[in-house]
Each structure stands twice: as structure tokens, then as C-alpha cells.
């Protein structure tokens, strides 16, 4: 996995982002803007904090701690997010559920997203600034492998 480059844009969706309905227009436009600008995706920002990606939940890792936004009306309650956090807890990884800023992303050791279509995908830069050393992080890659293995075990 080579990792994604993301850009940021204001989050212009209404405040019930946990409901998967007509909320898809703005993320679709943001994803298109990212691709046209040479990025892989967009992380949306409200009041200085990351809400989520265009079709994924956002995470950073700092000093071994996984940081992701807490469940609320501000984000979609992703099924991959729920599984990933359970697997991380099973492995005694520390998780903080709270908002985080763009500056925190730039200072993070690692970042990644989760979604049903991409599983766990490392993020290696934001707005042209490398995250960590600019390569997929070891925790993100480990969590990706764990997610795939656990999903295969549970497959019918």
C-alpha cells in the first residue's frame, strides 16, 4: 500500500452527517476537486477540525495513540470504523475519540482512513505536507492487515 495524498476543504454539509442521504453531493464535489488537483481525497474541515474524508473516517496516530473523532451527528458512523476500533482495542492500542486539527495532522506520526471500499488506507500527506516520514506508517499497515485477516475469518 503506497498511501494517499489528501487536501482539505471546508465542510459545507448540514449538521446531520451521520445520516447517509443527500449528504453525498458535497463529498462527491470535494473528491472531484481533489482528483483534479492531483490528490487522492479530501479531508473536510469545520471550525479548524477534521470531520472526515469524502467517503471515509479519518484518523491520526501520535506517540502510538490512535486519535479519531467521537461518534456524533458530525460524522458517518462507519461500520469499518467500528470494526477497526474493536480490533485496535483487542490489541491493547490506546484510542482517543476527539476532534483533531489540521495542524495536529501535520504533526502526527501517521494518518489513515477507514471505509468499506478501501478498508484501512494510510494517508501520507495533507495539503502537500508529509505526515511523519511521508511513507505509510507501521501502525496503519498493521491495522490494515488485521482488518483484512479478521474480515476473511468472518466471511461466510
Predicted regions and their residues:
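Helix-start/capping segments and mature chain N-termini
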Residues: 1-156
Amino acid at each position: 500500500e503506497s498511501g494517499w495524498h489528501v487536501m482539505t476543504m471546508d465542510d459545507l454539509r448540514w449538521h446531520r452527517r451521520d445520516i447517509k442521504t443527500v449528504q453525498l453531493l458535497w463529498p462527491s464535489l470535494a473528491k472531484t476537486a481533489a482528483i483534479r488537483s492531483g490528490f487522492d481525497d479530501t479531508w473536510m474541515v469545520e471550525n479548524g477540525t477534521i470531520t472526515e474524508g469524502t467517503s471515509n473516517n479519518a484518523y491520526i496516530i501520535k506517540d502510538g495513540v490512535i486519535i479519531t473523532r467521537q461518534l456524533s451527528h458530525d460524522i458517518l458512523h462507519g461500520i469499518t470504523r467500528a470494526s477497526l476500533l474493536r480490533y485496535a482495542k483487542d490489541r491493547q492500542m490506546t484510542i482517543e475519540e476527539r476532534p483533531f486539527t489540521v495542524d495536529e495532522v501535520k504533526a502526527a506520526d501517521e494518518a489513515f482512513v477507514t471505509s468499506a471500499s478501501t478498508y484501512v488506507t494510510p494517508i501520507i500527506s495533507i495539503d502537500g505536507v508529509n505526515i511523519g516520514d511521508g511513507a505509510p506508517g507501521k501502525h496503519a499497515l498493521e491495522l490494515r492487515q488485521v482488518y483484512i485477516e479478521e474480515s476473511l475469518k468472518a466471511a461466510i
